[in-house]
Amino acid sequence: MRIIDVDSHFQEPFDWFETANPTLAAKLPRMSVAEQLIDIAVGDLFSSVPPALRPDPLKLVPDEVRKVYERFLAGGDPPQQIIDAGAFLPAAHLPEARLAWMDARGIDKQIILPSSGYHPYRHAMRNAPELALQTLETYNRWATDRVHGHIDRLIPAAVIDLIDVDWAVAEITAMRARGARAAFVKADPHDNKALNHPDFERFWAAAADLGVAILFHVGGGRAAMHPGWANNGGDTTAFFRLASLSRRMVPQLALGAMIFGGVLERHPKLRIIVQELGIDWLPDFLMAIDLEADNSRPRVLSFSLYRLPLKPSEYVMRQVRVSVVYQQDVLRPTIDHVPKGLVVFSSDFPHAEGSQDAVSLYDAQLEGAAAGTRESFFGKSAEAFLGI
């Protein structure tokens, strides 16, 4: 049985950006470890809160997590959970060590996304947006250089912003030539335009023609929240949990735009993987999108008949896969209530949300599952879907 891991990461060396592009790094001050922690833990949440209502960001980080990181910043040991996840192993950023780590777990191939490699881009978008695309170019070339000679098993994901479509098409084309078969694209409007806006057609066409899968990953999109939800008398924990609930809307809105906007119909070779955004929303989502297309009972607010040739759920099964992450998702019963092959395996290595033992942990959860479910989940579905 082949095992394909559709969501893993580099844990880039702390000085990767300064080493990869010292001239650009000099124009964009380095984020501290504390700033990176805040960006990881509450960055997407914080951006939805008006500046006047924003509390101290460290107050949004759970007390124990904050204390552990404060000890780490003062020269102590890193958080045990991060150690256990493998973030400090050579396999976190060195290709030969990564391949040995994969071999020990029976993993054949991995898609690899950034960790701190994404931070210069986010930092630039807040402080020097004119440099943002250059930070992505720097990361994309660092990542493809890192796995050079191993792209048969280690599949680098380019990071793409659609704010400049000419740049996006050129970058995805260049990165495909360097071995990238996936592209991390924010599951959000770009340049205040929906993902199905005509301006983006050239990019979706290029991705489909190049055989580059689109990745909608956590942290690359957020569901809009009314700012008033943050104005609750100072209960930041309650607000944080509301924001966590809202994240399940991110993939639903992004996929809805791609389906109902006709993007998947116009580009049948386009492939999308939703990563680390949960799986428990899937059964309800599949039912809801098909109800929206049921012309026997048109809804008043739909305003017109559904005219695409396939049911929305059929576009999902043809062109979408959704991956799990161990600290968030339990396979059963969700995987029993969606079409076989829709939910696929990932380890999230070396992030704490995943597990180094993800293969065995998920294998145990699949005991007694329907025939073929295990093989499809671990690799058969992703292999056929991605053509790898």
Regions found by a protein language model. Give the residues of each.
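Well-ordered mid-protein domain cores that form the structural environment of catalytic cofactors
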Residues: 129-136, 140-141
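Mid-to-C-terminal alpha-helical segments outside catalytic/metal-binding sites
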Residues: 1-4, 12-90, 94-104, 108-109, ...
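Flexible loop residues that form catalytic
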Residues: 9, 115, 188, 220, ...
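Catalytic pocket-lining loop regions of alpha/beta-barrel enzymes
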Residues: 131-134, 147-153, 160, 166, ...
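Active-site flanking residues adjacent to catalytic metal/cofactor-binding acidic residues
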Residues: 4-6, 216, 275, 347
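Short glycine-enriched, charge-decorated loop/helix-capping segments at active-site entrances
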Residues: 126-130, 360-362
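Divalent metal-dependent hydrolysis catalytic cores, especially in the metallo-beta-lactamase
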Residues: 8, 79-90, 103-124, 153-161, ...
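A short secondary-structure junction motif
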Residues: 123-125, 287-290, 366
